[in-house]
A protein has these predicted regions:
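Positively charged n-region of N-terminal signal peptides that target proteins for export
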Residues: 1-6
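Sequence context surrounding c-type heme c attachment/ligation sites in exported
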Residues: 41-93, 119-177
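Alpha-helix-centered segments that form part of catalytic cores
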Residues: 104-127
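General zinc-binding finger modules coordinated by cysteine/histidine
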Residues: 100-102
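Hydrophobic membrane-insertion alpha-helices, especially the h-region
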Residues: 8-25
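Aromatic-capped interface at the extracytoplasmic side
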Residues: 22-40
Length: 177
């Protein structure tokens, strides 16, 4: 009798766990890196609306190498200081950037666009294919605070890859390790 109860409890637990997992995947809930709407506070506020919007600074100026590399780098403080060595130097936030720069201490920015460990995303190939950064990242030039706009789920990516005009590969190894 006890074995039957234990067996039933295990079966119910497994069924419940699988059900929750499937529900979360199909509803784009925060699971294995799909964080649509994620908008973390950063150690130093940075306005893409000001920099990319008002000043029209191209994404590739700060995110150097994004057109040649698999990854879009978080800008080094050197990039910030190219302008802020003379611009808004009296701002308390710029003073923190400057202090970190001269102390050779990188700022611990919070990563916004998270992908599962088993997924690889090559920024360079997407840029070479003519995809604008806004396709995946949204209209950052209108964002005071950066957030993840798209789900970045497998289904979302595959929908784009399946568009005939994109001529994008559909084999699993393109995106998965």
């Amino acid at each position: 009798m006890a074995k039957k109860i234990i067996g039933a409890a295990i079966a119910i637990g497994l069924l419940g766990g699988v059900s929750v997992f499937v529900w979360a995947l199909t509803n784009n809930k925060v699971v294995i890196g799909y964080n649509q709407g994620y908008e973390p506070d950063q150690p130093i506020p940075f306005s893409h609306k000001l920099h990319a919007g008002q000043y029209k600074i191209d994404c590739k100026y700060c995110h150097t190498g994004v057109d040649k590399s698999r990854h879009a780098s978080v800008p080094s403080l050197n990039v910030c200081m190219n302008c802020h060595i003379v611009v808004k130097t009296d701002s308390p936030w710029i003073k923190k950037v400057s202090e970190a720069f001269y102390a050779d201490k990188p700022i611990a920015w919070e990563k916004v666009h998270l992908l599962p460990d088993h997924v690889k995303f090559n920024h360079a190939s997407h840029i070479k294919a003519g995809k604008d950064c806004t396709v995946c990242h949204g209209n950052v030039q209108e964002m005071e605070k950066i957030k993840q706009v798209q789900s970045l789920s497998m289904g979302w990516c595959v929908n784009c890859h399946r568009q005939p005009e994109n001529k994008a590969p559909l084999n699993c190894s393109t995106c998965h390790y």
